[in-house]
Regions:
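A surface-exposed partner-binding patch
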Residues: 1-91, 96, 141, 145-185
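Compact, glycine/acidic-enriched structural inserts
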Residues: 90-126
Length: 185
């Protein structure tokens, strides 16, 4: 298991959630949940989430990943998920209306995200740059918040810090999906 030095625990993953997913997802995910719980890391960019609280957004926000299990939300409102069938991980980038496949291995995916020594893959696939740019002038969003573009990018918003506000994650994803439709990748 990868060591996460800046993890800020909010709460434990409910036991019923662990039991529900034990036979469905990687032992590494269960180990992560038991060791760390729900909270933030990677300077607040990554949020470990209860999948039960985001499963409805997966169904509403995309046509093709309804069976995927959401594991993390980023500080930019993207959902990192694991597919039930094959264990591959991916990221739904609501801000761009796109999906990117990541890796099959949970530990490698986490390492890809938090390795500050070799961040090229993270920059290419997770794209956290604007989050860290915003932190230079804005306070980090709370656990249930993220930075969102106002107006949203697909409606002409500009990808600049000046157009980023702190928004509620769920409401922001719902707004993007309501205004522009589900991700069709």
């Amino acid at each position: 298991m990868i060591e996460i030095n800046d993890f800020k625990k909010i709460e434990d993953v409910p036991q019923e959630v662990i039991e529900k997913y034990e036979s469905v997802i990687s032992d590494k995910v269960i180990e992560f949940w038991k060791r760390y719980g729900l909270g933030t890391f990677f300077d607040g960019f990554m949020k470990s989430i209860n999948p039960e609280e985001y499963t409805d957004l997966m169904g509403y926000g995309t046509q093709f990943y309804k069976e995927a299990i959401p594991l993390f939300v980023t500080g930019l409102g993207d959902i990192i998920y694991v597919e039930k069938e094959d264990g591959f991980m991916g990221i739904l980038k609501f801000r761009y209306k796109s999906t990117t496949m990541l890796l099959k291995n949970f530990d490698y995916t986490l390492d890809l995200i938090i390795d500050k020594e070799d961040d090229e893959l993270c920059k290419e696939y997770i794209e956290p740059q604007m989050y860290f740019e915003a932190l230079k002038t804005k306070e980090a969003p709370a656990y249930d918040e993220c930075f969102g573009y106002v107006p949203i990018l697909s409606l002409g918003g500009k990808e600049v810090v000046e157009h980023m506000d702190t928004v509620k994650i769920r409401e922001h994803i719902l707004l993007i999906t309501e205004l522009t439709g589900p991700i069709n990748d």
